[in-house]
Regions:
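Solvent-exposed soluble domains appended to multi-pass membrane proteins
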Residues: 2-7, 11-14, 18-269
Length: 269
């Protein structure tokens, strides 16, 4: 296939992403994810059932990229660290590569984390741009993670790298990753969490929803940049698991802590 025959496909994993409207007890002064909510009004959206809560990104990732269920693996197993060390694996990347797509992974964290650098090659990705290959200058307020804004240009670079092919790019964010500090680390937070909880928990939720706003801005910026390229493109954004904040089924409007949200965008009408 050529770029004229098929659209670019960008799949974006939103680390620890949860629509805060889904949490019954959580209130805030303004909507931290306006881009996500606007997309929900205009494009396909829904719930995604994931195998993990609070951690274990690689296993949500594995299910999304291969269509295989973690139920067929051992308790606590990470296929990236077991079977994919021995054999390759069909999935979205390999299937799209077989019909002529360029296939790329992009992540602003270490390439060896979850053995991704090996796993992605076994899954049919042509390239993997990890943080070792990026000029990262800014970090999240907890000091732990690269901010996600760098992923806009890094994702666009993958589309530019193959002028004659459509591309499948899988981009993984990290900015909303825990931990969520119990002390106030953002001096004048734009978004303030409220609810029946103590000050430490308030600080944690306030930190989290402000980081949600950062990833929401990343989503908006990525869409703008893709729109400037004048190529047919589909983007899917999805949450890999709920944040590590002790949420229970009864706290969620979905009634299930193993449900996250996804939303799509396209420029094809």
């Amino acid at each position: 296939v050529t770029k004229k025959d098929a659209p670019n496909i960008i799949c974006v994993l939103l680390e620890s992403f949860c629509d805060p409207d889904e949490i019954k007890f959580l209130h805030y002064n303004d909507d931290p994810i306006p881009t996500f909510h606007e997309l929900e009004k205009n494009y396909t959206t829904g719930y995604l059932t994931v195998p993990v809560v609070g951690a274990g990104t690689a296993n949500s990732e594995f299910e999304v990229l291969t269509g295989m269920s973690m139920q067929y693996f051992g308790t606590g197993e990470y296929p990236y660290k077991t079977i994919l060390k021995k054999t390759d694996c069909e999935g979205t990347a390999a299937d799209l590569a077989s019909i002529g797509y360029g296939t790329h992974a992009v992540h602003n964290n270490g390439g060896n984390f979850y053995s991704r650098v090996n796993a992605f090659s076994m899954m049919g990705f042509d390239t993997f741009t990890s943080k070792e290959l990026m000029n990262i200058q800014t970090y999240t307020p907890n000091g732990s993670w690269a901010t996600d804004d760098i992923l806009v240009d890094e994702t666009i670079k993958t589309l530019d790298s193959t002028p004659d092919q459509p591309d499948f790019t899988y981009t993984i964010t990290v900015g909303t990753h825990g931990d969520y500090p119990k002390e106030q680390v953002i001096e004048n937070p734009k978004y303030i969490a409220n609810g029946s909880f103590d000050q430490e928990t308030k600080n944690q939720w306030t930190y989290y929803i402000n980081q949600l706003n950062e990833v929401d801005t990343f989503m908006s910026d990525l869409i703008k940049k893709v729109n400037e390229r004048d190529e047919d493109t589909v983007i899917v954004f999805f949450g890999d698991h709920l944040p590590t904040m002790g949420l229970q089924d009864s706290d969620m409007r979905s009634g299930d802590i193993y449900k996250t949200k996804y939303v799509t965008w396209n420029n094809m009408g």
